[in-house]
Swiss-Prot record:
Mg(2+) 2 binds at residues 316, 320. Its cofactor is Mg(2+); Mn(2+). This is Germacrene-A synthase. It comes from the Eukaryota. It is an enzyme of class 4 (lyase). Pathway: Secondary metabolite biosynthesis; terpenoid biosynthesis.
C-alpha cells in the first residue's frame, strides 16, 4: 500500500487560507498544529530484526500453549493465567486453546463453588469469562452484600485489590444487572477515597483503573500498562513474560513502519499545502485505527483505514472550518457523483483533494477486486458519500440558525459521527473473514452496531459542544436535547451520559455467546467505542491532542520497551 499514490494537480494558490478582499469570510478554526512534524518519516525497518523477533517468539509461545491446556493446573490459577494472557494482548495466539478450556470450566461452573473464594479471585474469573464471551452470572457477587440491608458489606473496603477487581468487573455489565450497577458506584467512590494512601504497583493499578477501566481502554495501551503495573502477574510464568516482551517489540517495529508509510503518503499528497486549514493529525489517526485492531495480520487493513480516515479529516474540516455554504453544496454534489468530470464544478482549492480521493479509492478497489472483495471498498465509499450529505445537512442548519430537535439531530448525527465510515473502512483490508454475510450483518445495523455508533456520537458531543458553540455551530447534541426537552445544560449532559452508559451495556451483551458474527468482526465495533472513550472522555483529545493522545503516541512509537 505504500505505493498507492495520486497525482496532485498543480496551480494551487500557495496558501488556500489567505483571505483577500474578494474572498468570503470563512469560519476558520485555527486548529493547533501537529506536535510531531516529520518525526516518524525517519524510521527504517530492519526486516531481519522483525524476523528474528518472530522466530524468538515461537519457543515461549509453545511453552505458554502447554501451560494453558495443562490438565493438572488448578482452575482458579488457570483462569488467572488466561486473564494475564488477555490483558497482555496475546489472546489471538491461543484462541482455540483458551476457548476449549473455558468451554469446559463454564460447563462445570456452580455458584456453590464460589462460597469459599475471595472477592479478587471471583472478580478475575468473572472478567475472563465475560471478556471472552461467556455470560457468567453476576450473582457471584451477591455473597459480598449484606442480606438485611442489601448493600455491599463494609468489610470488602479493606480489600483494595478485591475492590479493584469488582470495579473492573462492573464495566462488563449488561442491562438489568443491578448488583454490578451498584458495585460500579459504590466501589468507584471507595477507590477514590483510598487511592492517595496507596503505594507501589497497587497505587498505579487503582489510578489506572479510575482514569480509564481496562474494558474501555485502547487494547495496545492497556497491554503495555498491564506489563508495567502488574509485574507479579506478568512474571508468574517465564514463558508469559518472555512472549509478552518479544511480542511488544515485534508490534513496535511493525507499527512504526506502518506509521512511516502513512506519514510519507500524507506528505506526498501535500494536503498541508493545498488545504492548510485542516487538522494535521497523522499519528493521532493512525493511533485511532491501531486501537481497532493491533494484530500483525491486519497491517494492510490499518494502512488503508488510516488513509480513508485522513480523507475524512480533510472533508470534515473543509465543511466545518473553511468552506462557504455554496462551496459545501457543490462539493457534496461532486462526492455524490464520484466522477472526475465533477471536479470542474468545485472550488479550485479542494480539487487536489477530490482527485486524490477518487484515485486512491480506485486503486484500493483494484487491489481488493483481485481478492474478490471489492464490495468492502464500495461499502466504504457509500459511507463516505453518506457522511458528506450529513455534513451538508449540519451546515445548512448552522447557516439558517436552526437548532434541530433531538431525534432529528440524532438521525443525522449518527451519520456525521464518522462511525459508519471508519467501521466500514476498517473492514476493507481484513481479508476472508469479511464475507458477504458479514458485510450484510454490518449493513443490517443491529443493536450492537447502534450502541457503538451512539457512543461515537454522544461522547464527542458531550466534550466538544462548547467549542462548537463558540464557533457558531448550532448542530450539537447538547443544544438539541436542551431545546427538545426544556432541560438545563447540566441535566442534558447527565442524560446523554446515561445513554452512553446504557449503550456500553448493549455492546457488552452483543459480545456474549451465542454471537451473530465472530468476535473478529465484533472486535473493531467494540474497539471503536473504546477509542471514542480514549479520545473524548476528558477533553477533545483529537482537536487538542497534547494530553492523552500525545502520551499514548510517546509510549508506543517514541519510547521503547527495554529488552
Amino acid at each position: 500500500m505504500a505505493a498507492i499514490q495520486a497525482n496532485v494537480t498543480t496551480g494551487i494558490p500557495a496558501n488556500a487560507n489567505t483571505i483577500t478582499s474578494s474572498e468570503p469570510v470563512r469560519p476558520l478554526a485555527n486548529f493547533p498544529p501537529s506536535v510531531w512534524g516529520d518525526r516518524f518519516l525517519s524510521f527504517s525497518l530492519d526486516k531481519s530484526e522483525l524476523e528474528r523477533h518472530a522466530i524468538a517468539m515461537e519457543k515461549p509461545k509453545e511453552d505458554l500453549r502447554k501451560l494453558i491446556v495443562d490438565p493438572t493446573m488448578d482452575s482458579n490459577e488457570k483462569l488467572g493465567l488466561i486473564y494475564s494472557v488477555h490483558r497482555l494482548g496475546l489472546t489471538y495466539m491461543f484462541m482455540k486453546e483458551i476457548e476449549s478450556q473455558l468451554d469446559k470450566l463454564f460447563k462445570e461452573f456452580s455458584l456453590q463453588d464460589c462460597e469459599e473464594v475471595d472477592l479478587y479471585t471471583i472478580s478475575i474469573n468473572f472478567q475472563v469469562f465475560r471478556h471472552l464471551g461467556y455470560k457468567l452470572p453476576s450473582d457471584v457477587f451477591n455473597k459480598f452484600k449484606d442480606a438485611s440491608s442489601g448493600t455491599f458489606r463494609e468489610s470488602i473496603t479493606r480489600d483494595v485489590k478485591g475492590m479493584l477487581g469488582l470495579y473492573e468487573s462492573a464495566q462488563l455489565r449488561t442491562r438489568g444487572e443491578k448488583v454490578l450497577d451498584e458495585a460500579s458506584v459504590f466501589i468507584e467512590g471507595k477507590l477514590k477515597s483510598v487511592v492517595s494512601t496507596l503505594e507501589g504497583n497497587l497505587a498505579q493499578q487503582v489510578k489506572q483503573s479510575l482514569r480509564r477501566p481496562f474494558h474501555q481502554g485502547m487494547p495496545m495501551i492497556e497491554a503495555r500498562l498491564y506489563f508495567s503495573n502488574y509485574e507479579e502477574e506478568c512474571s508468574s510464568h517465564d514463558s508469559l513474560f518472555k512472549l509478552a516482551k518479544l511480542h511488544f517489540k515485534y508490534l513496535e517495529l511493525q507499527q512504526k513502519e506502518e506509521l512511516r508509510i502513512v506519514t510519507k503518503w500524507w506528505k506526498d499528497m501535500r494536503f498541508q499545502e493545498t488545504t492548510p486549514y485542516i487538522r494535521d493529525r497523522v499519528p493521532e489517526i493512525y493511533l485511532w485505527i491501531l486501537g481497532l485492531y493491533f494484530e500483525p495480520r491486519y497491517s494492510l487493513a490499518r494502512i488503508i483505514a488510516t488513509k480513508i480516515t485522513l480523507f475524512l479529516v480533510v472533508l470534515d474540516d473543509t465543511y466545518d472550518a473553511y468552506a462557504t455554504i455554496e462551496e459545501i453544496r457543490l462539493l457534496t454534489d461532486a462526492i455524490n457523483k464520484w466522477d472526475i468530470s465533477a471536479m470542474e464544478q468545485i472550488p479550485e482549492y479542494i480539487r487536489p483533494f477530490y482527485k486524490i480521493l477518487l484515485d486512491e479509492y480506485a486503486e484500493i478497489e483494484n487491489i481488493m477486486a483481485r481478492e474478490g472483495r471489492a464490495n468492502t471498498v464500495i461499502a466504504s465509499k457509500e459511507a463516505f458519500q453518506d457522511i458528506a450529505r450529513g455534513y451538508l445537512e449540519e451546515a445548512e442548519w448552522t447557516n439558517n440558525g436552526y437548532v434541530a430537535s433531538f431525534p432529528e439531530y440524532m438521525k443525522n448525527g449518527l451519520i456525521t459521527s464518522a462511525y459508519n465510515v471508519i467501521s466500514k473502512s476498517a473492514l476493507v483490508g481484513m481479508g476472508e473473514i469479511v464475507s458477504e454475510d458479514a458485510l450484510a450483518w454490518y449493513e443490517s445495523h443491529l443493536k450492537t452496531l447502534q450502541a457503538s455508533e451512539l457512543i461515537s456520537r454522544l461522547q464527542d458531543d458531550v466534550m466538544t459542544y462548547q467549542f462548537e458553540r463558540e464557533r457558531g455551530q448550532s448542530a450539537t447534541g447538547v443544544d438539541a436535547f436542551i431545546k427538545t426537552y426544556g432541560v438545563s445544560e447540566k441535566k442534558a449532559i447527565d442524560e446523554l451520559k446515561i445513554m452512553i452508559e446504557n449503550a456500553w451495556k448493549d455492546i457488552n451483551e452483543g459480545c456474549l455467546k451465542p454471537r451473530q458474527v465472530s468476535m473478529d468482526l465484533l472486535a473493531p465495533i467494540l474497539n471503536l467505542a473504546r477509542m471514542i472513550d480514549v479520545v473524548y472522555r476528558y477533553d477533545d483529545g483529537f482537536t487538542f491532542p497534547g494530553k492523552t493522545l500525545k502520551e499514548y503516541i510517546n509510549l508506543l512509537f517514541v519510547g521503547s520497551l527495554p529488552m
